[in-house]
Amino acid sequence: MATSVLCCLRCCRDGGTGHIPLKEMPAVQLDTQHMGTDVVIVKNGRRICGTGGCLASAPLHQNKSYFEFKIQSTGIWGIGVATQKVNLNQIPLGRDMHSLVMRNDGALYHNNEEKNRLPANSLPQEGDVVGITYDHVELNVYLNGKNMHCPASGIRGTVYPVVYVDDSAILDCQFSEFYHTPPPGFEKILFEQQIF
């Protein structure tokens, strides 16, 4: 009897449930291990400034991913997807086979080739939110929740969200808790363990 009581008390003292706590998945954020040498990341890995590029901390494993960037201050910038082989010190990105980005002028570049372009009257401005969808074939751009019908493709391999800044640009990233509802079928970036 005394053994049962001690066991019960030990269980209550150690948290009471007797269950092993689940490990919480880390949040996707900008990855300070994969950024340019003159990049500054602040706001818990959600804001980029300085000069250069930075990858997000999780690759796009699931079929349809969505993420957003809010333009806090204009300048030179670009957003899209890239492999870990991209040179994050050499901007603008989109000049090689390792990145596919939309630049601040509305042009989408991959392998130094313009793949598409936003209409001239729809260029992102300070305060705008740019959403990106990626389905392992096509990247598409949304401006303040509106599909810009501006697809681009061509990149191969495991890709990560990427952003670069220069000339006083400041961008905030949203990998969850979005400003705008993702398009049907698209969702926040999931870590590989969350998919299976």
UniProtKB/Swiss-Prot annotation:
The modification N-acetylalanine is found at A2. SMART domains: SPRY (SM00449). InterPro entries: B30.2/SPRY, B30.2/SPRY_sf, ConA-like_dom_sf, SPRY_dom, SPRYD7. Gene3D superfamilies: 2.60.120.920. CDD domains: SPRYD7. The keyword Plastid does not apply. Keywords: Acetylation. SUPFAM superfamilies: Concanavalin A-like lectins/glucanases (SSF49899). Residues 2-184 form the B30.2/SPRY domain. This is SPRY domain-containing protein 7. It comes from Homo sapiens. The gene is SPRYD7.
